[in-house]
Amino acid sequence: MGRTVRDESTASAYWAAVNTFCALKDVHVLADAPVGCYNLVGVAVMDYTDAVPYLENFTPTSLTEKEIASSGSSEIVRQTIEKLQAPGRQLILVSSAESEMIGSDHERMLKMHYPEVRFFWSNSLGENEWQGRDRALKWIHEQFDDQKPAVVEPGTVSIIGPTYGCFNSPSDLLELKRLISGAGGELRHVYPFESSLNDISALKNSEVIVVMYREFGEALAGMLGRPVLHAPFGLAETREFILELGGLLNKRERAEAFLKLEKQTTLKPLWDLWRGPQAEWFPTVRFGVTAAKSYALGLKQFLEGEMGMQCLFSHNSAETDNTLIRNEIKEKQPQFLFGRMPDKIYLAELEAKTRFIPAGFPGPIVRRALGTPFMGHSGMIYILQEIVNALYDMLFNFLPINRRTSSGEVPPGKIVWTSQANQILNEMVKRAPFISQISFGRELKRKAELLAVKQGSDTVTPELLKMVS
């Protein structure tokens, strides 16, 4: 019997192809898909992920029941190509799950009638969005590289990533550019996001390649024959990145000078927070992460490995089981959860006191401003600042404020607790985030006593306590 998938949060390779190819300035993507598949990827979700109202270089064939049930999609593909062909515009035809199900492989037809149009079999039914991005970038190199030998330009660096649909990419990309420049590198290309299609041939001429994400880009980087680094998270990784890049570019002294300057400027808030009273909270902070691989690994490494906070779980959202995540949230009650919209929904369903911090898709969020990085030195400061400010908010919310209450909310008379009920209450309070334990215990006790009164009892028992927990 097959496993039921709950709240699938990772898109298919069809989405990957659209998000990758449409990021190139001179490419127009033709999707062999129903109009709904166009609207969902190119209009609706694009506005939630990238704050882009729609993709201008994306057109569907608008498959109907006729094409899917009988005639196939070749005729409608040819009609759409005729409308879209224009000088300086490279058309790429992409398969969707629907066209793949009816076996619409247009490779042969295109070679006969439209040899300049390329066909990418997205494998929508077989791969997820990260596998699809990796293969799409490799495919571009195979199709459009000029096959000339590399002419390496000393001191130059190119970045692979991001595409559309990568969480928080404007801020992370800016931080990565800043680190490269500080280490003495001259940025050549950001592929595909700030590039044209044929820039693929120029990537091999860069002295160093930086892969921005652990999720994709490795396949293309491996074809270029250049030294490869990955975008860093946290203190140790960022230091190593700067020094290693400086060494590869023969600019080690420049990199060391930049690192020294960073300690006096960008990293100064980290040192101040570490020496301040806020640092006393750090060992008590319990957090969880559910995000794409780069963020899942990076946040755990920085917050647990370097800041001494307690990581209750860290999941790669492309591989994890959302039912298990919901259960883990319920059982472990993290103080902070870096996650996606499904995780935020689980918190609401469980009435959890956890502070939610967006860290991945799906989920509607605008991150076009450049001040919210997670990567590099700037990312460390932003994340730590968010956590400390959230702790201040929590303290405010847990103050014993005198609220106006309706009659019946304060239990009349004295309510007795059995020793077993008290023991269970203490155990439940211990599992709550440290900073909120007093407030959590007080609220749970109030609810239990109110329920006892409603039931006509003057005693809280273990059975009654479990009814409100």
Question: Where would I find each of the regions flagged by the language model?
Answer:
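An N-terminal assembly and electron-transfer interface module characteristic of large anaerobic redox
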Residues: M1-V416
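Non-catalytic accessory segments flanking P-loop/AAA+ NTPase cores
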Residues: R403-S469
